[in-house]
């Protein structure tokens, strides 16, 4: 009788502080599909919430108790006794078993597990790669030369695509373990041990923190220009009178005046206007505005969950599409201004081949960087056999987008009267603060970056604190210290080195050295060697890729 009484108890214990209660108090989290497997019941025993509850069969109840018993033999983190994939029904046939003897089909489960079509997968990859690097592509083409720049963009796209292909195929080359749920750091750990795990973590943090620094510099820039636009509009000030610029309906300015360094001053001096002097004192691009952002963004970084900010991801796509629109419109208005000189520079034009082309390769390494999360993106592809095809199409679209933006901005830059060397590391800086189209672009990008910045901070927290303490939120003190370090780095760079092109190329070459060039090539060499299929051409080709990655990083320090 004791056994009968124990069998009649509820199989799912009560949980307090329930966040998302399901029907009949069922606890369900669709984000962890493997550790919380639903129990399958024949369709004859399935009911809706509003239907009369029908008891399940004795066989189904006994099977549920058996699985419940097995789950108690190990800790929840141990996957040893979880039912394997081949015995689990399809997602649309999975149901959650209630202790009251009924089964419910939860929409959140099937929706959370739904696969993406190839079109959605391609768009996701394109959208993920479209970041701040797009603002520096025209500057990179100027540094490399027009012809060389276009060739470098295409070649870097092909090289990073191949390395990304090797990342996608890396799991399938491991036959001794079940790699279904593995991410790329797990593959690195398999081949290189703890060194591979921690080194991949280090380089991933480099890319994240580098991106956050670039975001802080750009947000300071956009916030400064936004405030300057409003002030100039109210006081009827024309800011193109004090810098080298074109005199037409679509003005273009040269804030660095050929010095190669961005203008860090706020605005012009008006000796007779105390109000303007006061505004300039408290609204300076490098001395005050970066500190104003601390009050806006530091509290957002301390949120436990970034789910609210993830709702604004669509703004990234809108911003890129608007940049394409504004570049197209400006090119139509300005026309093309090109002259071809292969090696010798002229007063207004740069040569087609320049020794500074590694600066563009550094920028492009980050611009094409998706290698640390490509496995995750492709996991949800409905047709896994199309992964390689979809990846190639996405890379082609990204390459065409970079070429379109870079070529149009460079070719339409009005030379003369302005030299091509005036193209800024952020090409929006070549448009005056009073330009309405640029003002809208800066507003959109500023808001979009303010929503993405907490997400990047959350990812950095997950990777660093999660690995060190085993908890992504050990305490408010730990989180605050980490966020202060990240914010401090951003403020420091915005004040003393506000060159987004330089920051992008250094961080891109550093993180790309591991994730793009070394790890994919070494893993392929080791796997082929273990299978005794390694040939000299394969070995030499992948060693050349590693050498190119090292040369790319070293060259950044000599440019």
From Swiss-Prot:
Motif (CRAC motif): 455-461
Glycosylation sites: 238, 247, 264
Motif (CARC motif): 442-452
A single GO cellular-component term on record: lysosomal membrane
Subcellular localization: Lysosome membrane; Late endosome membrane
Chain residue ranges for the region called Important for arginine binding and amino acid transport: 128-133
Keywords: Amino-acid transport, Disulfide bond, Endosome, Glycoprotein, Lysosome, Membrane, Metal-binding, Sodium, Transmembrane, Transmembrane helix, Transport
One GO BP annotation of this record: glutamine transport
Topology relative to the membrane: Multi-pass membrane protein
Post-translational modification: Glycosylated.
Domain of life: Eukaryota
Intrachain S-S bonds: 254-422
Residues on Lumenal side: 140-145, 225-281, 333-354, 414-435, 499-505
Domains: entry comment: The cytosolic N-terminus part of the protein mediates interaction with the Ragulator complex. The cytosolic N-terminus part of the protein destabilizes the LFC and thereby triggers GAP activity of FLCN:FNIP2 toward RRAGC. The cytosolic N-terminus part of the protein mediates interaction with the Rag GTPase heterodimer in a RRAGA GDP-loaded state dependent and upon arginine binding, leading to the GDP release and SLC38A9 dissociation from the activated Rag GTPase heterodimer. The CARC and CRAC motifs mediate binding to cholesterol.
Quaternary structure and interacting proteins, as annotated: Associated component of the Ragulator complex (composed of LAMTOR1, LAMTOR2, LAMTOR3, LAMTOR4 and LAMTOR5). Associated component of the Rag GTPases heterodimers (composed of RRAGA, RRAGB, RRAGC and RRAGD); this interaction is independent of the Ragulator complex but depends on the nucleotide loading state of the Rag GTPase heterodimer. Interacts with TM4SF5. Interacts with NPC1; this interaction inhibits cholesterol-mediated mTORC1 activation via its sterol transport activity.
Known function: Lysosomal amino acid transporter involved in the activation of mTORC1 in response to amino acid levels. Probably acts as an amino acid sensor of the Rag GTPases and Ragulator complexes, 2 complexes involved in amino acid sensing and activation of mTORC1, a signaling complex promoting cell growth in response to growth factors, energy levels, and amino acids. Following activation by amino acids, the Ragulator and Rag GTPases function as a scaffold recruiting mTORC1 to lysosomes where it is in turn activated.
Name this protein carries in UniProt: Neutral amino acid transporter 9
Organism annotation: Rattus norvegicus (Rat)
């Amino acid at each position: 009788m004791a056994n009968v009484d124990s069998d009649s108890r509820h199989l799912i214990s009560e949980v307090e502080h329930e966040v998302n209660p399901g029907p009949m108090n069922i606890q369900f989290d669709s984000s962890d599909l493997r550790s919380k497997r639903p129990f399958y019941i024949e369709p004859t025993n399935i009911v809706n919430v509003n239907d009369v509850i029908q008891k399940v069969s004795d066989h189904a109840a006994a099977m549920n108790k058996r699985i419940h018993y097995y789950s108690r033999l190990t800790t929840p983190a141990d996957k040893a006794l979880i039912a394997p994939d081949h015995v689990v029904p399809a997602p649309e046939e999975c149901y959650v078993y209630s202790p009251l003897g009924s089964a419910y089909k939860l929409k959140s489960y099937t929706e959370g597990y739904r696969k993406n079509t190839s079109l959605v997968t391609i768009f996701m990859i394109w959208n993920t790669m479209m970041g701040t690097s797009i603002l520096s592509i025209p500057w990179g083409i100027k540094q490399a030369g027009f012809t060389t720049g276009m060739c470098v963009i295409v070649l870097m796209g092909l090289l990073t695509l191949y390395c990304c292909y090797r990342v996608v195929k890396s799991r399938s080359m491991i036959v001794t373990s079940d790699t279904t749920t593995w991410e790329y750091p797990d593959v690195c750990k398999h081949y290189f041990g703890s060194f591979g795990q921690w080194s991949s973590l280090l380089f991933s943090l480099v890319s994240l923190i580098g991106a956050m620094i670039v975001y802080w510099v750009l947000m300071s820039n956009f916030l400064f220009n936004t405030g300057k636009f409003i002030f100039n509009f109210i006081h009827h000030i024309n800011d193109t009178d004090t810098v080298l610029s074109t005199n037409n309906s679509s003005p273009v300015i040269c804030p660095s005046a050929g010095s190669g360094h961005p203008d860090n001053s706020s605005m012009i001096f008006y000796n007779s206007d105390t109000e303007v002097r006061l505004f300039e004192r408290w609204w300076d691009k490098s001395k005050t505005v970066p500190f104003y952002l601390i009050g806006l963004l530091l509290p957002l970084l301390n949120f436990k969950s970034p789910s609210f900010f993830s709702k604004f991801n669509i703004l990234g796509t809108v911003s890129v599409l608007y940049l394409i629109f504004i570049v197209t419109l400006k090119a139509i208005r300005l026309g093309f201004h090109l002259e071809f000189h292969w090696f010798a520079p002229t007063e207004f034009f740069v040569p087609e081949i320049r020794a500074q082309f590694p600066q563009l390769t550094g920028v492009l390494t980050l611009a094409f960087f998706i290698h640390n999360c490509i496995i995750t993106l492709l996991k949800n592809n409905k047709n896994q056999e199309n992964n390689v095809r979809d990846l190639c199409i996405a890379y082609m679209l990204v390459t065409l987008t970079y070429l379109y933006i870079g070529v149009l901005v460079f070719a339409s830059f009005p030379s003369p009267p302005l030299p091509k060397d005036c193209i800024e590391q952020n090409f929006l800086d070549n448009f005056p603060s009073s330009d309405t189209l640029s003002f809208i672009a800066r507003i959109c990008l500023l808001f979009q970056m303010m929503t993405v910045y907490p997400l990047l901070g959350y990812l950095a927290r997950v990777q660093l604190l999660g690995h060190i303490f085993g908890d992504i939120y050990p305490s408010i003190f730990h989180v605050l210290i980490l966020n202060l370090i990240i914010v401090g780095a951003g403020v420091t760079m915005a004040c003393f080195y506000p060159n987004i092109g330089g920051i992008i190329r250094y961080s891109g070459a550093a993180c790309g050295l591991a994730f793009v060039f070394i790890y994919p090539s070494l893993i392929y060499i080791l796997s082929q060697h273990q299978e005794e299929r390694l040939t000299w051409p394969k070995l030499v080709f992948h060693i050349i890729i590693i050498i190119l990655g090292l040369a790319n990083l070293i060259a950044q320090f000599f440019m």
